[in-house]
């Protein structure tokens, strides 16, 4: 039979040309005492000399009586589904709904009750999107091309929209771009010619005030620039758009419009603070990311406003949760100025229970869902009060922050940016399928529903890597995993998010350059050396286990939260089971608590027990040092450099890492890095050139890779220097905060324009998402479920 999807054409070939390999392959699946099979498992089960395209494309299989359902992914974002009848080798293509129904039957049985299907594809049918995977994560670039084409094809409509957009911008009641003298495209064209003639012979260094009256008479207000050289460039861009719009010109023009003066960053969960919070539950890289982010954004906003000559002080609020039982941190303070900024503040809003009483203690990020709706309302009122009006942009972080951002942005009509940091669905295998088994602990169904709502509400989504969106040829992206999935007994998703959607953009963060800089620098932080050496070598140090019997060995250093995904216990086992590596190097682990009784997090306590067990089992107390310290940023930067001085390495052994800020920090310090191949690190690191990637599922190979590098550096010290220099060069060119801030503000302006010209077209989507929120999310977030 012929299949309509080109992804499945290889099935004909495998049945006709490789039947002798395909039949045993199906037989092995049938013999297994389980119903679900992963891509890696199926590739190992196929015994042919060559791997046909169909086998290579397999992502998952579901075994049912007499037939096997396969999910195939021939290329990024391109999925198809087929069922093969094992007795006859007949097969047929099935829909995403039919495939999900097969999975549901394995959980709920043959007579499962009817379930609704969530399908957002019809709402996006008329929205432009690229067809090539090369454009995934380049949404702004694609939209500029599309919008330029729209203006060119229908200049009357397109230019009228641009005019209306220019007329809408004001601050504190004053127009910034155009006044009421220009109320048509024809008048704009005439006024523009007169303005360019007026400015033509004036010095570029002349300031706006000298021509303000004449320009206002023509219809132009002060937002065009401080100095006339800048104003001339701005007007020339407008002239080019009016004549023949080009994508690059349109982006440059929109990027100069003064439209962002205040923004709100939402990050409710964990202990969000500037000191004493790192190492506490649910508190890690996201806090560092946001604090560095807002510093860079404030600097960018101030620079842009200065170019415009506008005497406006930008304001940034980071809204998080107030925790009265703050455990020695400042998380019980309602407001706190962010150090290193002029007007960026942490604003803390409490969680309240059903009676309105403030919840005093920390709550796991997996259990905060009942509090978020009330939190969003209270936070919105505080935001409006402190900003004296609406923010110009709202940025959500992680699942909880993105949901709150969606609720506030929809109520206020503000542009929303989504940053996931990490989507839990790809971290926990089959966590959607077996959500009911883990509901008491993790509440995954509630979280995944919140994710689905917020990523579709959002005007634009930024990710640190391409893989976060769409994976690789061999692995599924985090967002891609939301294209179709099922929560048996609740609902199934047949079209949840489209990775080709132009709302996706990749922009990578950096590390604070005043903290994380090369070990070669003479301007170091010597005040921390004594404490660093205490952490490494002091006998009977409180909160530590193990000692380094031979302290002169090269040091393998790792530092992360002590949870299952970060896999610190896995690294200790790799190290301990490789005798040669133990003889050659020492291992320092900084993470969690050594004393289980000090932890309030269930998963962390489990990892503490495992860590002690591994050290005991392998007898590692003389070669592994485990410290439960929580380092400040300056201390962390100097720690990386101290390890680099001793020609050590940094290892990030996570089972999955969405980005890997510690990797950027270590590389910025000149420390060679070994990091997981799963997720963002494989984009950051050029394997073998600026660092090394590891497959955490193959611990013996990871240990050998570490050993090989350390031994090579001992025989050839220049090898360590080469990798170190390449790491420094890599982060300098690709991962820095000024570039991040510039791009994010460009995105905000372009998507602000896109929202303006298409807002009415999104109403149907909003109503659909409101229904999903009201009928599903609210029920899952009912306090009685917690």
Curated annotation (Swiss-Prot):
Gene3D superfamilies: 1.20.120.1230, 3.10.450.330, Glycogen Phosphorylase B. Transmembrane segments: none annotated. Residues 259-736 are annotated as: GT-B glycosyltransferase. Optimum pH is 6.0. Its EC number is 2.4.1.13. It catalyses: an NDP-alpha-D-glucose + D-fructose = a ribonucleoside 5'-diphosphate + sucrose + H(+). GO terms for biological process: sucrose metabolic process. One of its GO terms (molecular function) is sucrose synthase activity. Belongs to the glycosyltransferase 1 family. Catalyzes the reversible conversion of sucrose and a nucleotide disphosphate (NDP) into fructose and NDP-glucose; although the reaction is freely reversible in vitro, the physiological reaction seems to be sucrose cleavage. Unlike characterized plant enzymes prefers ADP as a cosubstrate, whereas plants prefer UDP. Its preference for ADP over UDP suggests it may directly link sucrose and glycogen metabolism. This is Sucrose synthase. The lineage of its organism: Bacteria, Pseudomonadati, Deferribacterota, Deferribacteres, Deferribacterales.
